[in-house]
């Protein structure tokens, strides 16, 4: 009897090809299109260029997913996780921004929606043996350690293990990543050869519910402007006005709106209580560097005692944003939920609220939220 796989069919080329490959491998395949955002329900008006369109981008994605399902002769279901997304992902996202932190909603979406609500729906409602996604990542079972390992994809430029760092053993045991050993170019070639409508569809970029528009406009739907001073962190001189410290991220250069300066300025720090945005000039970028950070809400994907000699202090690599190169670090345990991450060399623009994701070569060990940056 064939094993049944429910694919998260999003209307993009990656999930389309994932469906095709699984069919070729002999699985029983069905698609499930999920909708996590509703602009009307969520009062998403400001800057939303699609608000009056006859067909919103999400509905077009569904039509593309349906066309792929029809082409491959598989069933396609659809399900809404709009309330769940708001409760588990978006509420946290907004609360973090109100604190002038910079969260990563894609990581939370994977943890709570795609690999939890979606997974449970696929297994309990659609009788799936596995789910599959169009992510670029690998899952392998290590018989020596008796652990499912999340491993970097062959296409290192597209590798998405950073976004999957909050998953657990149960989730990995039920997940297939058919694109693990393919490059994006190879995926598009397969889609073209199979005449899939999504073959040349543009990749989605940025945060899914914002789309192609001003991030500031989007946030203004939920957080009111709070004007304050922009201050040179070195001289303490007021250089201008900002519209709210939550709209800026550490290391940001564009959009600070400081005119008449002799050189570019970067966001160096944020004081939420005083509502001050601190900036530094290009020649003073040392203010962007730090030597370590404190992290919490740690998630170890696997039993790290089977991978490191001393779980209280060990060396590994870490990424502090997507597509960043691996950085050598020492991870030092403070208690069960708090760790210090010491950098082998100073790093630039480490951002509170973002994820620190840990690797042992190509194996993703897990991730944690950056809570404090130590200069």
UniProtKB/Swiss-Prot annotation:
Catalytic EC class: transferase
GO aspect biological process, one term: tRNA wobble position uridine thiolation
GO molecular function terms attached to this record: ATP binding; tRNA binding; tRNA-uridine 2-sulfurtransferase activity
Active site as annotated: 109 (nucleophile), 208 (cysteine persulfide intermediate)
S-S bonds: 109-208
EC number: 2.8.1.13
Main location class: cytoplasm
Keywords, ordered alphabetically: ATP-binding, Cytoplasm, Disulfide bond, Nucleotide-binding, RNA-binding, Transferase, tRNA processing, tRNA-binding
SUPFAM superfamilies per UniProt: Adenine nucleotide alpha hydrolases-like (SSF52402)
Region listing for Interaction with target base in tRNA, in residue ranges: 104-106
Entries under Pfam families matching the protein: tRNA_Me_trans, tRNA_Me_trans_C, tRNA_Me_trans_M
Site entry: Interaction with tRNA: 135, 354
Region entry Interaction with tRNA, spans: 158-160, 321-322
Reactions that this protein is recorded to catalyse: S-sulfanyl-L-cysteinyl-[protein] + uridine(34) in tRNA + AH2 + ATP = 2-thiouridine(34) in tRNA + L-cysteinyl-[protein] + A + AMP + diphosphate + H(+)
A GO cellular-component term linked to this record: cytoplasm
Alphabetical list of PANTHER family matching this protein: MITOCHONDRIAL TRNA-SPECIFIC 2-THIOURIDYLASE 1, TRNA 5-METHYLAMINOMETHYL-2-THIOURIDYLATE -METHYLTRANSFERASE
Functional note: Catalyzes the 2-thiolation of uridine at the wobble position (U34) of tRNA, leading to the formation of s(2)U34.
Family the entry assigns: Belongs to the MnmA/TRMU family.
Protein name stated in the entry: tRNA-specific 2-thiouridylase MnmA
């Amino acid at each position: 009897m064939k094993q049944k796989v429910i694919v998260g069919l999003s209307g993009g080329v990656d999930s389309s090809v994932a469906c095709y490959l699984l069919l070729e491998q002999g699985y029983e395949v069905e698609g499930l299109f999920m909708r996590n955002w509703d602009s009307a329900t969520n009062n998403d008006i400001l800057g939303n260029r699609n608000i009056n369109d006859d067909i919103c981008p999400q509905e077009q994605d569904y039509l593309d997913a349906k066309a792929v399902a029809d082409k491959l002769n598989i069933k396609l279901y659809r399900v809404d996780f709009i309330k769940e997304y708001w409760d588990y992902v978006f509420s946290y996202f907004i609360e973090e921004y109100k604190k002038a932190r910079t969260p990563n909603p894609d990581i939370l979406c994977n943890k709570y929606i795609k690999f939890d609500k979606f997974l449970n729906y696929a297994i309990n409602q659609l009788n799936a043996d596995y789910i599959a996604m169009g992510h670029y990542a690998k899952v392998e079972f290590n018989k020596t350690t008796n652990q499912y390992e999340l491993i970097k994809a062959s296409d290192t430029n597209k590798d998405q293990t950073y976004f999957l760092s909050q998953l657990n053993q149960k989730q990995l045991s039920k997940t297939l990543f058919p694109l693990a050993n393919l490059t994006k170019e190879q995926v598009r070639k397969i889609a073209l050869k199979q005449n899939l409508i999504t073959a040349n569809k543009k990749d989605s970029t940025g945060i899914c519910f914002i789309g192609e528009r001003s991030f500031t406009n989007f946030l203004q739907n939920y957080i009111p402007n709070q004007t304050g001073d922009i201050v040179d962190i070195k001289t303490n001189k007021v250089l201008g006005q900002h519209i709210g410290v939550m709209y800026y991220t550490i290391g940001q250069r564009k959009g600070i709106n400081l005119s008449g300066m002799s050189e570019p300025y970067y966001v160096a720090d944020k004081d939420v209580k005083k509502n001050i945005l601190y900036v530094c000039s290009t020649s003073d970028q040392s203010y962007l560097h730090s030597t370590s950070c404190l992290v919490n809400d740690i998630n170890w994907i696997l039993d790290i005692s089977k991978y490191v000699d001393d779980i209280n202090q060990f060396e590994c690599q870490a990424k502090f944003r997507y597509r960043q190169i691996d950085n050598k670090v020492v991870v030092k345990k403070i208690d069960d939920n708090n760790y210090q991450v010491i950098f082998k060399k100073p790093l630039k623009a480490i951002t509170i609220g973002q994820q620190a994701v840990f690797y042992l070569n190509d194996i993703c060990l897990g991730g944690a939220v950056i809570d404090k940056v130590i200069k």
